[in-house]
Design a protein with these regions (language model features):
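Cytoplasmic helix-loop-helix junction between adjacent transmembrane helices
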Residues: 1-15
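C-terminal membrane-cytosol helix-exit motif in multi-pass small-molecule transporters
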Residues: 45-65, 250-254
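Intracellular juxtamembrane helix-capping segments at the cytosolic ends
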Residues: 1, 185-198
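Helix-to-loop junctions at the C-terminal end of transmembrane segments
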Residues: 132-144, 228
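Extracytoplasmic gate region of multi-pass secondary transporters
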Residues: 83-122
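A late C-terminal transmembrane helix in Major Facilitator Superfamily
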Residues: 197-232, 240
Length: 271
């Protein structure tokens, strides 16, 4: 696809990830609550085995057309823009998945709903995530800078609302629906920030995106868990607050870089 259409193509990949979340998280939660944790793990095993077989049978061979040396790939780490992107992605993903790791517990402890209701709410989150991925491709194609800047603020506002309405299930469903859409958009934004920082090494950049995202999930889960240990489940969202406030700084630094200003001009011309 063309460079202009690349965000839309990437969003389709994230739609697949979200679709897995739509089915996987609620179904696994339901199996664990109604049968046993062991059966939930068996479900994971079966699904992964099927995916492995499908990959062998249906994913075509993709030979390398132009080799990029390891030195050339690693050289992108000399870019300040890349490091701003990496830190921003780590923080944003840490906020989203740090809290998401405890969302079921939050709904059970704070909102006080049954496990069946939790499964439905998680399904709503996953479906909203798909919608967010669809919107993300369009938003990045129209004005990437605007989408990237707004996202941390939108997520922060949503988590603040979630903290104050945690006891009311109707309000929680609405907030989680919004968070699902925003998370879908944010995932695409994060991937765009890193790959756009290193167009000369797209595969390496994509690897750095996954590394940063996973690092954020690990740290975010630990920080949100620490708030639960010290203050209670309700305050797990404070970890997301801290990560998002810090991410705003690095997103701002990222979009101020020369390459980003060039992209801004392209966005304006596109409008």
């Amino acid at each position: 696809v063309s460079k202009e259409q690349a965000p839309k193509a990437v969003s389709k990949v994230f739609i697949g990830v979200s679709a897995g979340m739509v089915l996987g998280v609620p179904v696994t939660s339901f199996i664990a609550s109604e049968v046993s944790f062991s059966m939930a793990m068996l479900f994971f095993t079966v699904v992964n085995a099927l995916v492995f077989v499908a990959t062998i049978l249906f994913i075509p061979s993709m030979p390398v057309k132009e080799k990029v040396s390891y030195g050339a790939q690693l050289s992108v780490l000399k870019k300040t823009e890349m490091w701003h992107s990496i830190i921003a992605v780590t923080l944003i993903n840490g906020a989203m998945f740090g809290f998401f790791s405890y969302m079921s517990d939050y709904l059970k402890t704070v909102t006080e709903v049954s496990y069946n209701v939790i499964s439905v709410v998680l399904l709503v989150y996953g479906l909203a995530n798909i919608v967010g991925n669809v919107l993300a491709g369009k938003l990045l194609s129209i004005n990437a800078r605007r989408s990237i800047i707004i996202m941390p603020f939108a997520l922060l506002a949503s988590y603040i609302c979630l903290f104050f309405v945690g006891e009311w299930i109707t309000a929680m469903v609405i907030i989680i629906l919004i968070l699902g859409v925003l998370a879908g958009i944010a995932s695409n934004n994060m991937q765009y920030m890193i790959t756009d920082s290193a167009p000369e090494a797209p595969d390496f950049a994509n690897g750095m995106f996954l590394t940063s995202a996973n690092l954020g999930t690990t740290i975010g889960t630990a920080i949100c868990g620490a708030f639960i240990t010290e203050m209670g489940t309700r305050y797990s969202v404070f970890g997301a607050f801290l990560f998002l406030i810090a991410s705003i700084v690095f997103v701002y630094l990222r979009v101020r870089m020369p390459h980003s200003r060039k992209q801004v001009k392209m966005d304006i011309l596109a409008e």
